[in-house]
């Protein structure tokens, strides 16, 4: 694995305002890092012709993509020059979509980048936006090869600030204890410095921006009519996530908050498919069930299963199990093609997660029954041997649950920004039988302020341990909280050994 992260450098045009122009020259990256932290910038006023652009690197089933979204009026895409072996050539980004009404006043572009690419530069003359994020215009590329894997994977989930139409509103302006996602993203980038960031879904929570208390920071996302528009996508995800997007590529799966509206057009689901989905759409349409996406990060394979519409009411229903059985069959087929590689399933709703447990054996509440039933109905009646882990969110807690059987452990990371839930008493979870067929929980570690109490804000890290994965939970400051757990390497008894 190279010791220097490969960097994409975004070089802005010379017509920038003075403060932006001062930052136009790309800063040099220190060894092992992704460059200095970009300075804070303010977005241009709404309607500015020069507009504002956001760029990031995303892993997809079709490979690594550089994505670029701009509100400038040119409707053009920049070109990227990068090195590949001994050659260095420019490559134009492909325009995916043009502005579409008030919800999507953006031009969206993307470019496929080979795994071995390095030193990519956005051509100076091709950038039309007045402001580009990250402000230092540097974007990370994968620092693994086809024969290696990421050394450090950060897992986040349920990150948006909850502003519902009715009911309690999260304190979006308080980034310490109210809505700490901006702090979590900054500290994960600075302290953990991951090689890859996995987001397990739920990005867009501002259902009624008129009720939020951080309107001044988010022009264009302040009224009910503006919900799920581009400026709200920036407010809930791109602006707070900027330090992470400047540090590592991302792999994304969809959450239930990115659902379709009744018209299957626009809304949060339309925003997901326009900007963040594995395959982008230009028509504003929303699809209820996305295809499974198998994403390669060297010898680590991440398979995204869209569970955003699995049991919408969280009632324990198994309706539509067949839809998900087909997707888990696809997971198994992909895993069996590369039996020597590790596979992680990442899906928003957990397959096996305990929300509450009492003293009696039958007193246990777990999620998500329809996904569990779907796994049992696959051709294997289980997940493949080399599916080592399931990564999920949805429940606003951190929990590691294992069974010490062929069933992979369930890691739930729904604690990265949204209002926290109460968790179970882990002592009462151990030994409870859940799933199909019923299997006893071998180990349950839930990060809580007290047993059975409120969860703790933070994120998870999976570090390559030389043939295994070492799991840690990090609080909002980036500090490790609790034990370090090493994932076993045997297919018959998948579990964590914690110390």
Predicted segments with their positions:
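Acidic, histidine-bearing metal-coordination/catalytic regions of metal-dependent phosphoesterases
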Residues: 8-13, 17-174, 182, 186-194, ...
């Amino acid at each position: 694995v190279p010791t220097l992260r490969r960097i994409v450098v975004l070089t802005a045009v010379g017509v920038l305002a003075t403060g932006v122009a001062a930052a136009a020259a790309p800063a040099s990256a220190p060894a092992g890092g992704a460059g200095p932290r970009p300075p804070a910038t303010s977005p241009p006023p709404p309607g500015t012709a020069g507009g504002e652009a956001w760029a990031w690197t995303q892993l997809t089933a079709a490979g690594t993509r550089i994505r670029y979204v701009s509100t400038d009026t040119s409707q053009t895409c920049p070109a990227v020059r990068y090195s590949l072996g001994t050659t260095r050539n420019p490559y134009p980004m492909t325009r995916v979509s043009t502005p579409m009404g008030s919800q999507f006043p953006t031009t969206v572009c993307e470019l496929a980048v080979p795994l071995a690419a390095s030193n990519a530069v956005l051509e100076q003359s091709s950038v039309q936006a007045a402001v580009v994020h990250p402000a230092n215009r540097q974007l990370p590329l994968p620092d693994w090869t086809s024969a290696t894997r990421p050394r450090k994977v950060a897992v986040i989930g349920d990150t948006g600030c909850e502003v519902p139409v009715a009911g309690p509103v999260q304190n979006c302006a308080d980034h310490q204890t109210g809505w700490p996602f901006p702090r979590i993203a900054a500290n994960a980038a600075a302290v953990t410095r991951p090689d890859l960031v996995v987001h397990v879904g739920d990005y867009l929570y501002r259902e009624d921006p008129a009720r939020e208390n951080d309107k001044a920071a988010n022009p264009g996302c302040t009224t009910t009519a503006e919900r799920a528009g581009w400026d709200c996508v920036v407010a809930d995800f791109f602006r707070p996530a900027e330090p992470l997007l400047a540090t590592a590529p991302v792999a994304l799966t969809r959450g239930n908050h990115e659902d379709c509206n009744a018209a299957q057009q626009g809304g949060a689901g339309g925003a997901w498919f326009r900007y963040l989905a594995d395959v982008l759409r230009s028509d504003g349409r929303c699809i209820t069930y996305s295809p499974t996406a198998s994403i390669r990060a060297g010898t680590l394979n991440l398979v995204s299963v869209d569970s955003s519409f699995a049991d919408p009411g969280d009632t324990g229903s198994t309706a539509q199990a067949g839809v998900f059985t087909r997707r888990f069959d696809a997971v198994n087929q992909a895993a069996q093609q590369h039996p020597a590689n590790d596979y992680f399933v990442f899906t928003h709703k957990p397959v096996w997660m305990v929300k509450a447990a009492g003293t009696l054996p039958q007193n246990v509440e777990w999620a998500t029954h329809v996904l569990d039933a779907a796994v049992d109905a696959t051709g294997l009646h289980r997940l493949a041997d080399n599916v080592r882990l399931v990564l999920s969110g949805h429940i606003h807690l951190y929990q590691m649950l294992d069974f010490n059987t062929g069933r992979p452990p369930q890691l739930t990371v729904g604690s990265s920004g949204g209002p926290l839930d109460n968790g179970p008493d882990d002592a009462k979870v151990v030994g409870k039988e859940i799933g199909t067929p019923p299997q006893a929980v071998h180990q349950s570690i839930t990060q809580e302020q007290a047993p059975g109490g409120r969860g703790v804000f933070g994120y998870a890290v999976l570090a390559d341990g030389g043939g295994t994965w070492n799991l840690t939970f990090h609080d909002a400051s980036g500090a490790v909280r609790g034990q370090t757990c090493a994932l076993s390497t045997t297919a018959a008894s998948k579990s964590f050994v914690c110390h």
